UniProtKB/Swiss-Prot annotation:
Lineage: Bacteria, Pseudomonadati, Pseudomonadota, Alphaproteobacteria, Hyphomicrobiales
Function as written in the Swiss-Prot or TrEMBL entry: Component of an amino-acid transport system.
Keyword set, alphabetical order: Amino-acid transport, Signal, Transport
Domain of life: Bacteria
Protein name: Leu/Ile/Val-binding protein homolog 2
Length: 371
């Protein structure tokens, strides 16, 4: 039973890869399936597969079954563009993806020009929807809303402290750092240090020495978990006792694997955990019975499929432009994230960001819990 949970949708995906003649509605899954951010790609893949299996069992999109095809963008904009062009060439008309803002923004132009609707489960940079392309939607929140929470938290709790704001120079990481800095400054607190590092960097000893010399007692990180985990661990190794705060880019259990016990007390912002919603209890159990923990963006990807299918059925059409119109005009749509409506830009109606703290759970493992 555990192995066969999503076998139907996996079989459909294999059919699509081998030849598209059997496909009804082709939906592309664009995500980092390999590389340092593959954990997020796996969350998106699992969420999409589970939602498509459910949708197909209920009749699919206007009576047509959904077939999945996969594109590994490896969190790289250039590879993402190659994936987008491949999807277009294969006849894909709907995409769940991409994850990284730096990938979603350039690929959205390709999709828009070729009649492809995309729903991004993890793209939080405001620019993605601010351009108001007809085809861009997201099921996650925006960084201009996210930055308000840590900015206010640091202004309230470290008014006389020394704050360092670090980022990974990406549209997501630097964008989030800038939004956080903006709110912090608005509330009268000036950061002591603002600095970028490179994605993939491993040795942060020089940076941490700089933080120590500046007397920093709180570090805000705009970026993802691979670098965050190393910074947290190396801060502890070098004796820097500072509160580490970040955003939704570190919500992976891999953070604890990288940082070790030093992850204790780390704070991050994210939306309320949909695993704790009683309405999702059966679905959470299915994932866990299949050996997968549906953390972070799993449910955001699942909700993307639900929004797509519900909008198509409401429109009575599988034409991407007609579905896009329905997404903006015929909501709210019932999803695992709650009822979602989309505004004219493609942004969803979701509850605000909240703060989480990393600590040991009842199972003795480190995880993030809402404060």
């Amino acid at each position: 039973m555990k192995k066969s949970l999503f076998c139907g949708v996996c079989l459909c995906a294999l059919v699509a890869m081998g030849g598209t003649s059997f496909a009804d509605i082709m939906v592309g899954v664009g995500a980092p399936l390999t590389g340092s951010q593959a954990a997020f790609g796996e969350q998106i893949k699992r969420g999409v597969e589970a939602a498509v299996a459910e949708a197909n069992a209920k009749g699919g999109m206007n009576g047509e079954q959904i077939t999945l095809v996969y594109g590994d963008d490896a969190a790289d904009p250039k590879q993402g563009i190659s994936v987008a062009n491949k999807f277009v060439g294969d006849g894909v008309k709907f995409v769940i993806g991409h994850f990284n803002s730096g990938v979603s923004i350039p690929t959205s132009d390709i999709y828009a020009e070729n009649g492809v609707l995309m729903i991004a489960p993890g793209t939080t940079n405001p620019t993605f929807t601010e351009r108001e392309l007809w085809n861009t939607f997201r099921t996650c929140r925006r960084d201009d809303k996210q930055g308000i929470v840590p900015g206010k938290y640091m202004a309230d709790n470290y008014k006389d402290g020394k704050v360092a704001i670090l980022h990974d120079k990406t549209p997501y990481g630097q964008g989030l750092a800038d939004e956080t800095k903006k709110k912090l400054n608005e509330l009268g607190t000036k950061e002591t240090l603002y600095e970028g590092v490179n994605v993939g960097e491993k040795d942060f000893s020089a940076l941490i020495a700089k933080l120590k010399q500046a007397g920093v007692n709180v570090v805000y990180w705009g970026g993802l978990h691979p670098e965050a985990g190393l910074i947290i661990r190396q801060m502890a190794d070098q004796g820097l006792k500072a509160q580490f705060i970040s955003g939704d880019g570190i919500v992976s259990n891999e953070l604890a694997s990288i940082a070790g016990p030093a992850v204790e007390g780390t704070l991050n912002t994210f939306g309320p955990d949909p695993r704790n919603n009683p309405d999702n209890a059966e679905l959470v159990k299915k994932f866990r019975d299949a050996g997968f923990e549906p953390e972070a963006y799993t449910f955001y990807a699942y909700a993307g499929v639900q929004s797509l299918v519900n909008a198509a059925n409401a429109a009575g059409s599988n034409d991407p432009m007609e579905v896009a119109t329905a997404m903006k005009e015929k909501g709210p749509f019932k999803t695992v994230l709650g009822d979602i409506s989309f505004d004219a830009k493609g942004d969803p109606s979701l509850s605000p960001y909240v703060m989480f703290e990393w600590r040991k759970g009842e199972d003795g493992k480190y995880n993030y819990f809402q404060k």
